[in-house]
Amino acid sequence: MINVYDILKERGYIKQLTHEEEIRELLGKEKISFYIGFDPTADSLHVGHFLQMMVMAHMQKAGHRPIALVGGGTGMIGDPTGKTDMRKMMTKEQIEYNCNCFKKQLAKIIDFSEDKAIMVNNADWLLNLNYIEFLREIGVHFSVNKMLTAECFKSRLEKGLSFLEFNYMLMQGYDFLELNRKYNCVMELGGDDQWSNILAGVDLIRRKESKSAYGMTFTLLTNSEGKKMGKTESGALWLDPEKTSPYEFYQYWRNVADADVEKCLRLITFLPMDEVRRLSSLEGAEINEAKRVLAFEVTKLIHGEEEAQKAKVAAEALFGGNAKDLGNMPTAYIDKDDLNNPLVDLLAKCEILPSKSEARRLIKQGGLYVNDEKVTDINLVLTEEHVTEDGIMIRRGKKNFNRIVVE
């Protein structure tokens, strides 16, 4: 049977490892428990988390047990990694609700039945910690000098780093130790921005338990220009269909740049590598076949085959002019009374764009169309003349479509 390490390596997930040869040997001969942490700062996972979910799924398919840790405790502090400002603190109720939402989304590609995967909340052990005992047992193993060299703290030192956030690395290291003791968890995985925190946990277990522990980071999902993928004009690309519709989700992947198709097929689908190579070799107009496959496969994983098929049909209807299938396109319904209002007001009210200012910005940039006509007037008012048989068609940029139907 193929070693999952080789699968992860071939598909390009792996960025850094603590002990490469040991990890490869371990994954090939034993079934291990490993964990990935999720920071519950929102009530939905987004595309940035999707790559982590894929790694968990590949590992589970090879017989290893994923532990999904939600940071109900650390979430009350906030991870300073990659942040320029201190995060707003959330209530316990918010965090608990977000954790429940995460499990539902993770369960779409991770099997939680019969102890094949487990979800834990670090609030269970962090919230009742005795501070003096924690300092004596854990704090003694952390060098402040060494911590200050970590990338996650460097960028914050000039602007100000609170002692609250400085504790985050100790908390995350303690999470790994706790999971090692309770579940024999021997490996922590995470995005490459978590490397310093992962090293801290590996080192803590080796010091406290005199046992082997390992860490692995994987590449972040970036485009060919090095920018993080998953951002749209409306904000983040969420996995919750209420926040990002299956159609919008499908369209995002259908419209990725040609240069990003191969990477996306490798990292966020389960297509065999031979098929990935075949699709990635297509050129010219044929690359659209690869993009359609990518969009369908990714949407199917997150929203199910039925929703993926609906999104595909709606996208093809739009370009093929088949009006009867437009019902699968993101559609907002308004009353007749809502007409004769400024377009920017309606776009914000229908949540097609996050705000009026965003709508104005898009109009100024020449990126907004009504019924395929470019909008040049920021004060444009929609009237009955704009209502067609299919509703009012709104296009953002070249390929993002919405429909407004007047009831």
From Swiss-Prot:
A motif ('HIGH' region) lies at residues 40-49. A motif ('KMSKS' region) lies at residues 228-232. InterPro entries: aa-tRNA-synth_I_CS (IPR001412), aa-tRNA-synth_Ic (IPR002305), Rossmann-like_a/b/a_fold (IPR014729), S4_RNA-bd_sf (IPR036986), SYY-like_C (IPR054608), Tyr-tRNA-ligase (IPR002307), Tyr-tRNA-ligase_bac-type (IPR024088), Tyr-tRNA-ligase_bac_1 (IPR024107). One of its GO terms (cellular component) is cytosol. It holds the Pfam family tRNA-synt_1b. Keywords: Aminoacyl-tRNA synthetase, ATP-binding, Cytoplasm, Ligase, Nucleotide-binding, Protein biosynthesis, RNA-binding. It is found in: Cytoplasm. GO terms for biological process: tyrosyl-tRNA aminoacylation. It catalyses: tRNA(Tyr) + L-tyrosine + ATP = L-tyrosyl-tRNA(Tyr) + AMP + diphosphate + H(+). Its EC number is 6.1.1.1. PANTHER family: TYROSINE--TRNA LIGASE, MITOCHONDRIAL, TYROSYL-TRNA SYNTHETASE. This is Tyrosine--tRNA ligase. It comes from Clostridium botulinum (strain 657 / Type Ba4).
